[in-house]
C-alpha cells in the first residue's frame, strides 16, 4: 500500500497556505513549492482521512496537460523531480516525490476562469429558471447534460477557504482585468478547453466543465495551479453518455453519494470516510489518470 501524505512539514521553508488539497511554500522571492496532498474535500469541507495517491494523480495529470498546452500558453513550471529542487528539499523526498512542483511565483489573477462545454450542475438549474447561464442567453429546449454548440466562458470570484466562489458577468471580469488582459484570458481558456475536451473524448472521458487559474509573471500571462484534473473539472465517461439526465462522474461521486446517504449537514467536522468509499474514490481518480495519460503513476 502506498504511503499517503495528509500534511507536509518542510521546516526550512515558509508555509504560505494550506488549502483544501495543496500546501504552498515560499522557496525564495521568485519561486514556490506546491505540494498536492491526499486530502479530499466535499461541499467545501475537508474529510478527516485521505485518499491514497490522490495527490500524485492530480499532480501528474496537471503535468501531462501543461506539456500538451505549452504551445497555447506558457506555464509556471520550473521542475517536478525532487533531484532538480534545491538541495535543502532532498531529505523531504517522501513527502514530495511525484506530488510536488517547483514553480515561478506569478501574481495570480483575481478571477477563476470557468468554462462550460455541457449544461449541467448550477448552470442547468439557472437555465431552467431563466434560459441563461451566467449572462449567456442559450437556445430553448436544451436537455440536462447536453453539449453546448460553443463552450461558455463564465468567470467567478475567488473565495477564501470554506467560502463559495461567486459567478460574475463578463463585463465585471473585463472591468477587473482590463479589456486587453480579459480578451487574452478568455481566448486561452477556450483554446485549452477545446483541445483538452477533444483529446479526452477520444480517450473515453467527457470534460463537461472545468476551471483554470492564470497569473502574470515577468509581464506575461501564464497558466498556474492545476489543469483539467478530476478536482478542477467535471469528468464523465463517454460510454453510456446520454443527454437528458445527470451523468456519473470520475471524481468524488461515491463520496458525495455516501455523504448524502448519511445526511451530512455540509458543515465541519466531517465524518470518517469508510475504507470501501475511499478505495472506490481512489480507483475512479486512477481510472481517469490511466485513460488520459496512458502511462504509469510515478511513485
Curated annotation (Swiss-Prot):
Catalytic function, reaction form: 5-amino-1-(5-phospho-D-ribosyl)imidazole-4-carboxylate + L-aspartate + ATP = (2S)-2-[5-amino-1-(5-phospho-beta-D-ribosyl)imidazole-4-carboxamido]succinate + ADP + phosphate + 2 H(+)
PROSITE patterns, per database record: SAICAR_SYNTHETASE_1 (PS01057), SAICAR_SYNTHETASE_2 (PS01058)
Cross-referenced Gene3D superfamilies: ATP-grasp fold, B domain, Phosphorylase Kinase, domain 1
Any Gene Ontology CC annotation: cytoplasm
Pathway terms, separated by semicolons: Purine metabolism; IMP biosynthesis via de novo pathway; 5-amino-1-(5-phospho-D-ribosyl)imidazole-4-carboxamide from 5-amino-1-(5-phospho-D-ribosyl)imidazole-4-carboxylate: step 1/2
Keyword Heme included in the entry's annotation: no
Biological process (GO), any one: 'de novo' IMP biosynthetic process
Keywords: ATP-binding, Ligase, Nucleotide-binding, Purine biosynthesis
Family per record: Belongs to the SAICAR synthetase family.
Protein name per its UniProtKB record: Phosphoribosylaminoimidazole-succinocarboxamide synthase
Gene: purC
